[in-house]
From Swiss-Prot:
Its main location: cytoplasm. It comes from the Bacteria. Pathway: Carbohydrate biosynthesis; 3-deoxy-D-manno-octulosonate biosynthesis; 3-deoxy-D-manno-octulosonate from D-ribulose 5-phosphate: step 2/3; Bacterial outer membrane biogenesis; lipopolysaccharide biosynthesis. It is an enzyme of class 2 (transferase). This is 2-dehydro-3-deoxyphosphooctonate aldolase. GO terms for molecular function: 3-deoxy-8-phosphooctulonate synthase activity. SUPFAM superfamilies: Aldolase (SSF51569). It catalyses: D-arabinose 5-phosphate + phosphoenolpyruvate + H2O = 3-deoxy-alpha-D-manno-2-octulosonate-8-phosphate + phosphate. NCBIfam families: KDO8P_synth, PRK05198.1. The gene is kdsA.
């Protein structure tokens, strides 16, 4: 699949979707995008910047949701034009899709909305690449039906993203078999290594997370075989305004990605999966 100027697929080099969970400020967005662009250029990893202008599914009414549509989209436009990177953002049922699609390169549908047929089809109809996150409640073999809804709009630029599955209350686990199963859809499979360590709503109305497990799960996913990696990162995760406990420190990204790139190259050299 052609994606933002590069080829995405199981037999292609690993690509990265990364950035802060939510847009906190223009300065932070430009800083992180510039840092990640330079790092990925050095490592020769295709890169897409991500951040959200509205986190509509925060645990608490008092949680920071973002700068809103107009300001957030303006910041993403500056990231794209000033830093020179493709951008991804998530959209919701009330998002003005035409306006967002005029700026961003990739649309993302939230996990909680993956079963909303009208929503999935409206997003796919924008004819932009779409990263569809698998719901925490959904079996991996059910993703073929979600993908079919999107492709029924004539859009073949669809990705399937694994972000963990509910395991009791306030806990997620990663079933690596799901990566293999979702590959059967024929879509590039992306692994979200940061939301997969989230503890949803488990901290008195605020989601917690187990950041220390991000490297292990990311390495496991790369070893199983994926097309892309999704990671939320922040210069100061402990003070991030959203999803800090499951964000990876920006200054540790390069070291982690060096090991993941090496693992991806080994997998793609010896794999019989393609």
């Amino acid at each position: 699949m052609r994606l933002c100027g590069f080829e995405a697929g199981l037999d292609k080099p690993l690509f990265l979707i990364a950035g802060p969970c939510v847009i906190e400020s223009e300065e932070l967005a430009l800083e992180t995008a510039g840092y990640l662009k330079e790092m990925c250029s050095q490592l020769n990893i295709p890169f897409i910047y991500k951040s959200s202008f509205d986190k509509a599914n925060r645990s608490s009414i008092s949680s920071y949701r973002g700068p809103g549509f107009e300001k957030g989209l303006s910041i993403l436009e500056k990231v794209k034009s000033q830093i020179g990177v493709p951008v991804l953002t998530d959209v919701h049922e009330d998002t003005p899709l035409f306006e967002v699609s005029s700026v961003v390169d990739v649309l993302q549908t939230p996990a909680f909305l993956c079963r909303q047929t009208n929503f999935i089809q409206k997003v796919a109809a924008m004819n932009k690449p779409v990263n569809i996150k698998k719901g925490q409640f959904l079996a991996p073999w059910e993703m073929k039906h979600v993908i079919a809804k999107a492709k029924a709009q004539g859009n073949e630029q669809i990705m399937a993203c694994e972000r963990g599955v509910s395991f009791g209350y306030n806990n997620l686990v990663s079933d690596m078999r799901s990566l293999v199963i979702m590959r059967e859809t024929g879509c590039p499979v992306v692994y979200d290594a940061t939301h997969s360590v989230q503890l949803p709503g488990g901290n008195n109305g605020v989601s917690g997370g187990q950041r220390e497990f991000i490297p292990a799960l990311a390495r496991a996913a790369v070893a199983v075989g994926i097309s892309g990696l999704f990671m939320e990162t922040h210069p100061d995760p402990d003070n991030a305004l959203s999803d800090g406990p499951n964000s990876w420190p920006l200054d540790k990204m390069k070291q982690l990605l060096e090991s993941l790139k090496a693992a991806d190259e080994v997998y793609k050299k010896y794999s019989t999966d393609f």
